[in-house]
Amino acid sequence: QPREPFHPLFGGMPYTPLSLEFQITQENLGHAGHLVYLGTLFEEVLQSDTYENGKGSTVSKVLQNYQKTHGISAIAGVPNIGTDLNWTGHLFGQANWYAFGRLAWNPDTSSGKIAEDWARMTFSNDKSVLSLVLKIMMMSRETYVNYTMPLGLNHIMNYDTHNGPEPWHDDPVWTAFDYHKITKDSIGVNRTAKGTGATRQYHNPVGEMFDDIKQCPQEYLL
């Protein structure tokens, strides 16, 4: 999805080596037709606090928990290349491969720093060029989320391609109602302790935040 919270397995399995898989290909992010810099998405996940050992127990630190996991750690990526000479369909798609590599090497690197390094190597060191390119890159993912997945809604997309609208698709497990539970009285899936209980899988205060409609960030609300 354009945005999801981190999985509660990170922070819930302290003695088990875990690998984080990022999707580099833009399956749910506009394919090669939309400029979406994924470095900010990757950083958002890696810097999410699991509170496994109190404040500061980020997903990044969970992945680097070498003492408990016998020195084993990994980050995987799922890319997709086409027949274009630049592989990715548009030039900025290459920035996502670059961002993945940099963060796999050092998961605490700033996505802004990575974007700047890539822009300098790709375009120019000219300040006016960098300013414009970085502005576009750093806002691109959030912009895509806002025009395709408002309020945390998901799967508003074509069934086959995961790109573009298809409200006429008739499938009992791929409809707005199935995913959004829209009725005349409400919208959204109740994942709180009074619903599916999914929020209980997170350490507090993360679980408490997701469990409270007044505290839950709007981007995760539905």
Segments (PLM) and residue ranges:
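Catalytic domains of carbohydrate-active enzymes that cleave complex glycans
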Residues: 54-222
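Active-site capping/gating regions of soluble enzymes
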Residues: 1-72
